[in-house]
Amino acid sequence: MAFRKLAVAAAAVTLLSACGDNNLFNATAPTISDVYTVFALTGTPPAYPSALDTYFRQPVRVDGAGSFDVAFDIDPSGKVIIYPVKLVVRTLTGERRIGLMRVTGDFDLVTSAPKATYQTDSALVVSPHEVVVIEAARNGSGDACQFALSPNIYTKLIVDSVAVATRTITLQTVMDPNCGFRSFEEGIPKN
């Protein structure tokens, strides 16, 4: 039995080597910058986009399918509450791991996602101009990183402004669409 496993492993290595793809673990897509306006979860109609799908780079409405990464609300003091999807809805397909991390410093100077533990089990309350990095696992069935060595897509965001009267939040983001890559620098990432 051990010989059979060894033979299968050797065949797999040979097959991968024969493909001749020297860029197997290189990023292929550039980082992407966007600006969004989303609505608060409370005090707005449910059809309004109150969440963000970081991989597809679009504000979306909160739905029972959990087809978003984070949702936003405004607390009584005007700060923004960022919720990972699992704190907003429970889906039939199970939880997708979304982590949040507050990062000190200027938005433009945060050039890569930190290699640390991301907060996955609680919301994050931020003031305008605070930087947050989102770690979104994208390794579900049919997902972007289903077969990648690292299942995570990283996005940094900053709340540019909060309009309490209209319950809107303006965000600026930079997303690295390459599975496992952490760079927020312009162009195709190297790490």
Language model segments and positions:
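Sec-dependent bacterial lipoprotein signal peptides
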Residues: 1-19
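Surface-exposed, beta-sheet-biased, low-hydrophobicity segments with strongly acidic/polar composition
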Residues: 19-191
